[in-house]
Amino acid sequence: MAKKSMIIKQKRTPKFKVRAYTRCERCGRPHSVYRKFKLCRICFRELAYKGQLPGIKKASW
């Protein structure tokens, strides 16, 4: 779980556009965030296994 101060800091508009970065909307993790879902890899995996992400299924071949 991310620190609340960092989540609040990230929500402010940065002085320069290149300083903007993505965070997981569920836990606030700044790394490994899928832009399409706005989730980090860990939250994405949990929700996919529970079947809460429509159109996502485990690959098998």
UniProtKB/Swiss-Prot annotation:
GO terms for biological process: translation. Zn(2+) binds at C24, C27, C40, C43. One of its GO terms (molecular function) is zinc ion binding. Its cofactor is Zn(2+). Keywords: Metal-binding, Ribonucleoprotein, Ribosomal protein, RNA-binding, rRNA-binding, Zinc. It comes from the Bacteria. SUPFAM superfamilies: Glucocorticoid receptor-like (DNA-binding domain) (SSF57716). GO terms for cellular component: small ribosomal subunit. The keyword Endoplasmic reticulum does not apply. It holds the Pfam family Ribosomal_S14. Gene3D superfamilies: 30s Ribosomal Protein S14, Chain N. The keyword rRNA-binding applies. InterPro entries: Ribosomal_uS14, Ribosomal_uS14_bact, Ribosomal_uS14_CS, Ribosomal_uS14_sf. Part of the 30S ribosomal subunit. Contacts proteins S3 and S10. Belongs to the universal ribosomal protein uS14 family. Zinc-binding uS14 subfamily. This is Small ribosomal subunit protein uS14. The lineage of its organism: Bacteria, Bacillati, Bacillota, Bacilli, Bacillales.
